[in-house]
Curated annotation (Swiss-Prot):
The keyword Glycoprotein applies. Belongs to the adenoviridae E3_20 family. Glycans are attached at N73, N137. It comes from Human adenovirus B serotype 3 (HAdV-3). Disulfide bonds: none annotated. The keyword Glycoprotein applies. This is Early E3 20.5 kDa glycoprotein. E3 proteins seem to be dispensable for virus growth in tissue culture cells. They are potentially important for virus growth under special conditions; E3 region may help adenoviruses to evade the immune surveillance of the host. Keywords: Early protein, Glycoprotein. InterPro entries: Adeno_E3_CR1, Adeno_E3_CR2.
């Protein structure tokens, strides 16, 4: 039971690891970079789990050039999660809008990542609502580790921990009943 809980928490942490958090002031313009190759489809994921394609919305609030999404004159309505994918690679952004008097980072294009614990339930909800969109991020800078590699390493470590716990359990139970012979080690012919 504990190993299952650890596996679920580790999996959710690996999924939210690549989310980029961006703080922008009200009234500014922000450009979100999509994956490098192919045509990118952008999705906006709302807090309630719903989603929409910002490039298909009427008006001049969102500008898409095939790869990047530009949000013009940001208000608090544009705060939330944005997801860009070319169905092979993806990038995930969390935009936090602050009042214009609050200082914000000068660079409006963001590509580093950090994850908050409060984003895990929102990410899980969004994953359940978007089954056709692949949630893998294999476009990485040369000095960063892709999410798929982190997921594989995490799965191997959890698997080895389970095997180790099973071996320890077997060793402890076998010591209690030393008079019993081990059927696997009995070679009587």
């Amino acid at each position: 039971m504990i190993s299952t809980t650890i596996f679920i928490i580790t999996s959710l942490a690996a999924v939210t690891y690549g989310r980029s958090h961006l703080t922008v002031p009200v009234g500014s313009t922000c450009t979100l970079q999509g994956p490098q190759e192919g045509y990118v489809t952008w999705w906006r994921i709302y807090d309630n789990g719903g989603f929409a394609r910002p490039c298909d919305q009427p008006g001049t609030k969102f500008s898409c050039n095939g790869r990047d999404l530009t949000i013009i004159n940001i208000t608090s309505n544009e705060q939330g999660f944005y997801y860009g994918t070319n169905y092979k690679n993806s990038l995930d952004y969390n935009i936090i809008v602050v009042p214009a008097t609050t200082s914000a980072p000068r660079k409006s294009t963001f590509s580093s990542s950090s994850a908050k614990a409060s984003t895990i339930p929102k990410t899980a909800s969004a994953m359940l609502k978007l089954p056709k969109i692949a949630l893998s991020n294999s476009t990485a800078a040369p000095n960063t580790i892709p999410k798929s590699t982190i997921g594989i390493i995490t799965a191997v470590v959890v698997g080895l921990m389970i095997i180790f716990l099973c071996i320890m359990y077997y060793a402890c139970c076998y010591r209690k009943h030393e008079q019993k012979g081990d059927a696997l080690l009995n070679f009587d012919i």
